[in-house]
Amino acid sequence: MKKSSSFSGSLGFVLAAAGSAVGVGNIWRFPYLCAKDGGGLFLLVYLVLVLTFGFTLLTTDVAIGRRTKQNALNAFATLNKKWKFLGYLTFLVPTLIMTYYSVIGGWITKYFTLYLVSSGDAAAQDGFFTSFITSPVSPIVFMLIFLALTAWVVYCGVEKGIEKYSRYIMPGLLLLIIGIAIFSLTLSYTDESGMTRTGIEGFLVYIKPDFTGLTVQRFLNIALDAMSQLFFSLSVSMGIMITYGSYVKDDVDLNKANNQIEIFDTGVAFLAGLMIIPAVYVFLGTDGMASGPSLTFISLPKVFAAMGGVGRVIGAVFFLALGFAALTSCVSVMETLVANCMEIFRKSRKEMCAAVGVYSLVTAVLICMGYNVLYFELTLPNGSAAQLLDVMDYISNSFLMPFISLLTSILVGWVVGPKWIIAEVEKNGEHFGRAKLYSVMMKYVVPVVMLILFLTSTGLGSLIFGGR
């Protein structure tokens, strides 16, 4: 089947795919895990996994997309008709993620506007974030702004929308992160006890491997953290890379392009740690690190406030960079939904953008209301306390994505065979230097690791085998 939409070339694909991979998780989760898991030790483990596990999953999704020229919904059926159900499972992931990603994008938009109008100090006050997300109107307004931007890019299409904006946004994101990272290294602060901490010391905390108290169990936990971060970072097992792969022209060197995506994604994750860990260490010490929204919307505003006047500028630049990362990722999620719906309903991009936009709006409003009129709290199987947004995130990220990767590894590794993917990577005579490694990973390593990750991330492992 010939796709009517495509990227103009390798660079357009790499920037768009990197934009999808580089999301808020790179910026608010990677630095936290690095600080928690021994600094340089985590970095080393993560790098090894990128070169083995990461490239295997990324290569699989992109190659399936380009060879079948289909979106995820139909691509798996092309490999084997009995596996069509896997396409529907994959379609569920962006369907769920789209319900809440624009809500998070709205939070980022709110904070960016605060710093833009020099009101950033208010964000550093205790209780500000909770007060904002529980407000009945404000989160919906900022979500609408972010969702409108996302829908516009997708509406413009692959080459004139996603590729065009990625060519500007991704270099801009990289420059902003590099700028803040360099600034973080120059920081110095003396606390009330007279202790002075510097950005260079924070940098050493970041990159120096900490083997204190290292046991086999702790190393396995570090490896599992790195694996989960890598898995969620690369946008695999949600149909995005299959969809983007279907837009890649046949003359593009897939192996080279995938390597570039890996480098860009890993580089941004490293720079995010370099941007955040020294700054948080200088003003809050090692106890100031937190994960996710707590780091981004509570800890960092306190850091920016402690910087004084320059903190307002740095805060605006930081949330602009985070907004870029969120936008490119949300665009890829929405594009996957639109592309699949165009296949299902045989309608135009314009019509499906409108339909998916309405769906995203309605569900995002419900997610916003989950912090006020629809508020509830329950305990997930992995032990975490959850509201409505957390439930959607758990089902999509902790349950469906590892499960889909497990099934994909069985399909490719044992049903159609790794040679099916390798042939696509080498179709133009390009050398696939890691072909043997790919085969071993896809047949033996990925299925086992994904089963472990699935049981661990869902909390089902503790329920089945007992223990903590």
Question: For the regions a protein language model found, what residue spans apply to each?
Answer:
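Select transmembrane alpha-helical segments in multipass membrane proteins
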Residues: 6-17, 42-45, 82-95, 141-146, ...
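Membrane-water interface regions at transmembrane-helix termini and the short interhelical loops
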Residues: 33-37, 63, 78-79, 85-94, ...
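A generic transmembrane alpha-helix motif of multi-pass inner-membrane proteins
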Residues: 382-413, 433-468
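Membrane-embedded translocation segments of transport machinery
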Residues: 2-7, 167-327, 331, 345, ...
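Hydrophobic alpha-helical segments of multi-pass membrane transport proteins
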Residues: 327-332, 353-367, 371, 390-424
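Transmembrane helix-boundary motif of multi-pass solute transporters/channels
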Residues: 9-47, 240, 256-259, 263-266, ...
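Inter-helical loop and helix-membrane interface segments of multi-pass membrane transporters/permeases
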Residues: 4-5, 33-37, 70-89, 102-161, ...
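Membrane-interface "cap" regions at the ends of multi-pass membrane proteins
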Residues: 1-28, 57-62, 66-78, 84-85, ...
